[in-house]
């Protein structure tokens, strides 16, 4: 299941979404994420998936690759759905012994589940279509006004990029540790859910040690290349927003404003 996580991975393709400026994609992802939690009805949240589907088609990424990335969320989504089904008061739809499933619980559970799916898909699309270097440069340029008040903008952008880049690295490291422990008799696939969770506890120490080792190696590599933060740093390929970038930014911002103004009517 861990190998199915696509968050933090980058797939180099030539698509309209890949060619967009990273600032455009960051702004679109941020506004979409906020709007997703402003939408008040199940119908509006369901329709919010339409731009995600259009974006997936435009990226030219295999559909099964996107669906595979959502697979690790299913346990959390099912748990969230059950919590809303069993704890939300309202008109009873089905009664299962002492538990009553309400229509309101069905609506709330479906809304929250869809929000999680669309949010994960939007964030994954950002990292799948944007290289770590471009994402770092885009975040730094977006946050550059913060330099005037002394905020460490470059360092924040660099940390965010490294954190996203390390997600697939740590997943790969976890799989290696699990295979090594399985060869020594460890069992991660059988037993109840609680037993499976407990079996993952012995992974934490070697995984943390591996993460610290990789962080130390990265720090040494950056120092060997005379990295001293963003002061005086130039870019080989400066980011320049095209007409398409401005059009997408204006369109996304316009839809976001309309949602904020008329969310009660949706």
UniProtKB/Swiss-Prot annotation:
GO terms for cellular component: plasma membrane. InterPro entries: ABC/ECF_trnsptr_transmembrane, ECF_transporter_component, EcfT. The keyword Lipid metabolism does not apply. Its main location: membrane. It is found in: Cell membrane. GO terms for molecular function: transmembrane transporter activity. The chain crosses the membrane at residues 26-46, 47-67, 69-89, 116-136, 151-171, 192-212, 246-266. Pfam families: CbiQ (PF02361). Keywords: Cell membrane, Membrane, Transmembrane, Transmembrane helix, Transport. It is a multi-pass membrane protein. Transmembrane (T) component of an energy-coupling factor (ECF) ABC-transporter complex. Unlike classic ABC transporters this ECF transporter provides the energy necessary to transport a number of different substrates. Belongs to the energy-coupling factor EcfT family. Forms a stable energy-coupling factor (ECF) transporter complex composed of 2 membrane-embedded substrate-binding proteins (S component), 2 ATP-binding proteins (A component) and 2 transmembrane proteins (T component). May be able to interact with more than 1 S component at a time. This is Energy-coupling factor transporter transmembrane protein EcfT. It comes from Heliobacterium modesticaldum (strain ATCC 51547 / Ice1).
């Amino acid at each position: 299941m861990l190998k199915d996580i696509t968050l933090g991975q980058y797939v180099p393709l030539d698509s309209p979404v890949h060619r967009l400026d990273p600032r455009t994609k960051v702004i679109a992802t941020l506004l979409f994420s906020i709007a997703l939690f402003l939408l008040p009805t199940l119908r509006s949240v369901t329709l919010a998936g339409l731009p995600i589907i259009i974006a997936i088609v435009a990226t030219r990424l295999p559909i099964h690759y996107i669906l595979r990335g959502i697979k690790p969320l299913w346990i959390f989504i099912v748990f969230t759905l059950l919590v809303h089904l069993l704890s939300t008061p309202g008109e009873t739809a089905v009664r299962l012994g002492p538990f009553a499933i309400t229509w309101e619980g069905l609506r709330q559970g479906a809304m929250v589940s869809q929000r999680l799916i669309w949010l994960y898909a939007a964030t994954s699309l950002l990292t799948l279509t944007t290289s770590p270097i471009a994402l770092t440069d885009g975040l730094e340029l977006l946050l550059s006004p913060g330099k005037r008040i002394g905020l460490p903008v470059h360092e924040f952008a660099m940390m965010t990029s490294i954190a996203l880049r390390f997600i697939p690295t740590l997943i790969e490291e976890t799989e290696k540790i699990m295979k090594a422990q399985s060869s020594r008799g460890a069992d991660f696939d059988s037993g109840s859910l609680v037993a499976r969770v407990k079996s993952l506890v012995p992974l934490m120490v070697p995984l943390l040690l591996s993460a610290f080792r990789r962080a130390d190696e990265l720090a040494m590599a950056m120092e060997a290349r005379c990295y001293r933060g963003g002061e005086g740093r130039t870019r080989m390929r400066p980011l320049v927003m095209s007409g398409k970038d401005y059009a997408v930014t204006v369109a996304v911002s316009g839809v976001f404003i309309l949602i904020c103004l008329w969310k009660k009517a949706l």
